[in-house]
Amino acid sequence: MARYIFITGGVVSSLGKGLASAALGALLQARGYKVRLRKLDPYLNLDPGTMSPYQHGEVFVTDDGAETDLDLGHYERFTGRPATRQDNITTGRIYQDILTKERRGDYLGATIQVVPHVTNAIKDFIVDSNDGYDFVLVEIGGTVGDIEGLPFFEAIRQIKNDLPRGDVIYIHLTLLPYIPSAGELKTKPTQHSVKELRSIGIQPDILLCRTDRPIPKEERRKLGLFCNVRESAVIEARDADSIYAVPEAYHAAGLDDEVLAAFAIAAEQPPALERWHQINERIRNPEGAVTIAIVGKYTGMKDAYKSLIEALSHGGIANKVQVKLDWIESEVFENEDPAPFLEHVNGILVPGGFGQRGAEGKIKAAQFARERDVPYFGICFGMQMAVIEAARNLAGIEQANSTEFGPTAEPLVGLMTEWLRGNELERRSNAGDLGGTMRLGAYPAALKRGSRVSKIYGDVLEISERHRHRYEVNTAYKDRLEQHGLRFSGMSPDGVLPEIVEYEDHPWFIGVQFHPELKSRPFEPHPLFSSFIEAALVRSRLV
């Protein structure tokens, strides 16, 4: 039967509960245990699919097509276990399910209340389908004291009494701020946070304290005394030079030992952390460096590209080089020559996105990469802009554009329903729902034999990758584009939807309709990112 570890946060948000959960999961996994990680999000949205990247950051898509919190990306990268839609739930989804049941009459006329109906739904989600796992780690989003989080805290309080004694522990992630004028770390915010947690019936077993310096013995003693935890359970979570150094750092601080002790489990063997050590050695001692320009529209919010950043670092790990990122707002190129911004870089990546803002700048970035032989990686929207660039500047289709931006005489890119219905432009109503209208999750793609991408994937002819898009490249223009050198080297197995384009006579120019960054791991870098960084490394030696 699974044991449960609940991770809560206090004092301030954005302390890294997701990363802490992922690192602890990796440590338990390294000891031979089977782990599952889940995330409870207290916001009222059904999912983050329609939320602004500036507010929520990246939307992480699972194989089964769920749009989830970016923390699930950390879970996958650290444990290697693919997440599913059953690993993330929001208040909005819970209320939707409850109200659907109420309208259906499932509650037999009962008054629907937060306790017990909402809390029971949360508990049912937490314990569902956990057979075969030794530990289930459950992260509660937000901080203690947030009004929207109260039903979740009440549910995890109740669940300790529902399960056998000793099967549940609570870890509280908190902040120890350093006050320069006083010259000391302050424990009072943590004390108040734990007091708030205890007021709703939850006593933390372990305090995980974020800090930028060692915790003095006196402060550790004070935290243990006033927060009612063992002194050994006050764990120092120092800032690390890389997120992949966190598992080793947490082990050195005693987190996994303290977790096992809280469950009364004897720690017979230390965790096998050799591969983590090897990864960190490569990160700390690179044999070179490459600079990649990311030409996007959310560059002011790096969390919008979290998986992309990590996938590029994985490509660097595979090639033993440091990957430096040059963030460029694509709108800049609409009024300025891209050359001064891009001449010094070793590779250009145009990531996914939605909407017209900055689109012309991305097209100019693709043109610069094509004409100057700079490695180019276009992902989703980045592939579509590369196709439009080829249509305009190689095939002579001057009005080539996307129907996403409005009516166009030459719809190189449009809604999938448009092309599947014989190019009769059929558009979703502007008043319609945005949620649930995309191609989401893992889909297969057939690769052309002998193509560059086929070789990158290891000479395979079929792959499976995760998608998140409404628009597709129009296959009616496929032959004209191929006549001018843009090869459609990957298609859906039925030949209807373009998946990959490339230039054979370019050092490295690939556009993909899917999101390969979502499947990259530090120990298994995605082959496209490894190859892209390798091409950038070759470019760096030529410039």
Curated annotation (Swiss-Prot):
Top EC class of this enzyme: ligase
Catalytic activity: UTP + L-glutamine + ATP + H2O = CTP + L-glutamate + ADP + phosphate + 2 H(+); L-glutamine + H2O = L-glutamate + NH4(+); UTP + NH4(+) + ATP = CTP + ADP + phosphate + 2 H(+)
UniProt binding sites for L-glutamine: Y54, G353, F381, G382, M383, Q384, E404, R470
UniProt xrefs under CDD domains: CTPS_N, GATase1_CTP_Synthase
Keyword field: ATP-binding, Glutamine amidotransferase, Ligase, Magnesium, Metal-binding, Nucleotide-binding, Pyrimidine biosynthesis
Stated regulation of activity: Allosterically activated by GTP, when glutamine is the substrate; GTP has no effect on the reaction when ammonia is the substrate. The allosteric effector GTP functions by stabilizing the protein conformation that binds the tetrahedral intermediate(s) formed during glutamine hydrolysis. Inhibited by the product CTP, via allosteric rather than competitive inhibition.
This enzyme's EC code(s): 6.3.4.2
Residues that, per the record, bind ATP: S14, L15, G16, K17, G18, L19, D71, R238, D239, A240
HAMAP family for this protein: PyrG
Subunit organization: Homotetramer.
UniProt-recorded name of the protein: CTP synthase
Gene source species: Rhodopseudomonas palustris (strain HaA2)
Name of the gene this protein is made from: pyrG
